[in-house]
């Protein structure tokens, strides 16, 4: 252990010294690499994805059409090519990062021969089943991308909130979630050297790199990786100091009111600081990992001073280009207006004040000032709509009862429990009656189970008319065929498609709105929806940082478990909008103010 600690301290000092000595050339070169990966690399991937979607005859891939997509041999082949290109770009990016570290001030040898050799080594590394090992490694790193050395192409990838959110709603789910997180964390630590090994030891197959990384982190050696935390603290301290300087200058120049150009410059400054910080972190961590297995690559000779000056001028020009693009983007962002009259929809009522989809939860949602309250309904065996998210009632009742296989009289009134609250299962009619009494409208989500009769959609339309809410309530479903048929049967119903994950464009223009999960939302999709006369809702937005972020987008509605929080944060943002608050929102650090 003592030997590991001494080696760790020695390597940390060496990394910091190297970073300080070559900081300008490092930041400039990696900035260009990051820029090329997120423009040309991302464009190639987007273009190939478009080819995949065109050949599958669908505008976008969702959970509705996933099966037909995967059973098409042509799209499967193109999808394999897409994954292969993604793997190659990641491999190439890390190869170039290693080259930058090794060259330092020397000329980068990245000509045609370099790319030819890298391509040959890549295909050798992932040939056969080793490609599956590489994909397994990438999937394994997803929960920890923001904490590890990750590709620029994967930095915005994370586990969708609807997956983790559902697991965290029950005790067993929490055990599973945190248990899996701990297991994934352990495997990430054990495989931390895999990618650096794969790009430096050119004859290695990827599975061999995984095995070697496992060996390098055995026993007390795993603590060497954790020792990098001290370097992270230093980088965070520098970023904090620069950020504080920017906040102070912006507040001094602009006073209490934000003007357009100062806001634009401030956004650009924040982006630049965070961008540089990420690059330095990536470079420092990779450099530290390389020292862990000592590839013994000789340092290349430095270039002559006059050539160094020419190269620095060229690199500075390219960096100014990147900064100009960033400034243009932030000019657009500063001039864009956030969504006005944002609708707040209580997700299954208000979970913090009652059992989901219960009358008490509905009442709490109404008192919180929600515009709508969302609920889920499932058809019983005898044709009655029951308010429930799950077909199987075990999660809330403890009883292994399936709604779609049961008579309504046998399940209505069953006691349901969640988070210390108790209630009972109710019918759609009783829920609507309570909503009318409270003066709140509903967003009804249809949950077909596959056991419904052929006239399922007609039964629902008739029920909406019977309750006189067919034109005032919103209706949505994750089953696109179901919601499109409902719209066809009654055009007065405001219909929407529930989208849990999506690649590409929207798959239907027959609905009135799209309810899209946070993971798949982006401003480009929102603009397309609005151009086509559709509204876009985003779910399920619960954290303060996410709420603040979406309050400044063009989304039409936020679906949340905490409607009270959304209304409170709306008021706070309107009352307190200093540059410090602005910075904390941009960096997802608003929670600091609540400490």
Question: What does each model-identified segment do?
Answer:
Residues 341-345, 372, 439-443, 472-474, ...:
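Structural preference for beta-strand elements that scaffold enzyme active sites
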Residues 347, 365, 376, 411, ...:
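Conserved, mostly hydrophobic/aromatic
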Residues 1-344:
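Hydrophobic alpha-helical membrane segments
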Residues 331-382, 386-387, 394-396, 401-405, ...:
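Membrane-interface segments at or immediately adjacent to transmembrane helices
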Residues 389-493, 586-594:
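Metal-dependent phosphodiesterase/phospholipase catalytic core, i.e.
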Residues 226, 497-499, 504-595:
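C-terminal active-site rim and adjoining tail of enzyme catalytic domains
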Residues 124-125, 222-225, 437-441, 469-472, ...:
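Loop/turn elements at helix/coil->beta-strand transitions in domains of secreted/extracellular proteins
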Residues 348, 375-377, 446, 477, ...:
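A cross-domain feature marking catalytic cores of carbohydrate-active enzymes
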């Amino acid at each position: 252990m003592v030997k590991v600690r001494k080696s760790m301290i020695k390597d940390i000092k060496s990394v910091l010294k190297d970073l300080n000595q070559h900081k300008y050339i490092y930041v400039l070169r990696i900035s260009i690499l990051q820029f090329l990966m997120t423009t040309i690399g991302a464009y190639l991937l987007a273009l190939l994805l478009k080819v995949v979607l065109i050949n599958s005859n669908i505008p976008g891939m969702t959970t509705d059409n996933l099966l037909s997509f995967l059973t098409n041999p042509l799209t499967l082949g193109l999808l394999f090519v897409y994954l292969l290109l993604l793997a190659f770009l990641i491999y190439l990016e890390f190869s170039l990062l290693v080259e930058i570290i090794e060259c330092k001030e020397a000329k980068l040898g990245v000509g045609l021969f370099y790319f030819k050799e890298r391509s040959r080594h890549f295909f050798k590394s992932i040939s056969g089943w080793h490609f599956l090992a590489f994909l397994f490694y990438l999937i394994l790193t997803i929960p920890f991308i923001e904490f590890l050395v990750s590709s620029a192409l994967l930095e915005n990838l994370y586990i969708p909130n609807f997956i983790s959110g559902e697991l965290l709603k029950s005790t067993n789910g929490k055990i599973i979630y945190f248990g899996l997180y701990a297991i994934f964390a352990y495997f990430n630590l054990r495989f931390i050297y895999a990618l650096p090994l794969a790009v430096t030891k050119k004859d290695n197959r990827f599975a061999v790199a995984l095995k070697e990384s496992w060996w390098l982190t055995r026993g007390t050696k795993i603590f060497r990786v954790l020792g990098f935390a001290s370097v992270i603290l230093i980088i965070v301290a520098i970023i904090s100091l620069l950020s504080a300087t920017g906040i102070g200058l912006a507040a001094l120049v602009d006073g209490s009111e934000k003007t357009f150009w100062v806001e634009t410059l401030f956004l650009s400054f924040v982006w630049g600081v965070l961008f540089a910080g990420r690059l330095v972190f990536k470079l420092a961590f990779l450099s530290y990992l390389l020292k862990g297995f000592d590839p013994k690559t000789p340092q290349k000779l430095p270039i002559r001073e006059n050539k160094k000056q020419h190269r620095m001028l060229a690199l500075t020009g390219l960096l100014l280009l990147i900064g100009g693009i960033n400034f243009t983007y932030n000019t657009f962002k500063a001039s864009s207006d956030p969504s006005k009259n944002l609708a707040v929809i209580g997700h299954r009522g208000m979970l913090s004040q009652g059992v989901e989809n219960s009358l008490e939860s509905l009442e709490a949602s109404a008192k919180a000032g929600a515009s709508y309250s969302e609920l889920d309904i499932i058809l019983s065996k005898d044709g009655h709509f029951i308010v429930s998210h799950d077909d199987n009632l075990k999660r809330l009742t403890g009883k292994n009862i399936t709604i779609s296989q049961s008579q309504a009289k046998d399940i209505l009134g069953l006691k349901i429990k969640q988070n210390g609250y108790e209630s009972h299962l109710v019918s759609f009619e009783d829920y609507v009656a309570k909503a009318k009494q409270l003066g709140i409208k509903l967003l009804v989500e249809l949950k077909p189970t596959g056991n419904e009769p052929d006239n399922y959609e007609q039964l629902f339309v008739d029920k909406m008319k019977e309750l006189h809410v067919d034109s005032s309530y919103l209706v949505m479903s994750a089953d696109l065929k179901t919601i499109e048929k409902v719209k066809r049967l009654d055009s007065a119903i405001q219909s929407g498609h529930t989208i849990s994950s999506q690649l590409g464009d929207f798959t239907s223009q027959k609905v009135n709105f799209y309810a899209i999960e946070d993971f798949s939302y982006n401003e480009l999709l929102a603009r397309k929806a609005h151009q086509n006369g559709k509204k876009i809702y985003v779910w399920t937005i619960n954290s303060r940082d996410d709420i603040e972020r979406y309050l400044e987008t063009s989304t039409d509605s936020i679906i949340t478990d905490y409607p009270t929080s959304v209304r409170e944060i709306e008021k706070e943002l309107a009352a307190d909008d200093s540059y410090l608050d602005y910075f904390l929102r941009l960096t997802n650090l608003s929670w600091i103010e609540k400490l």
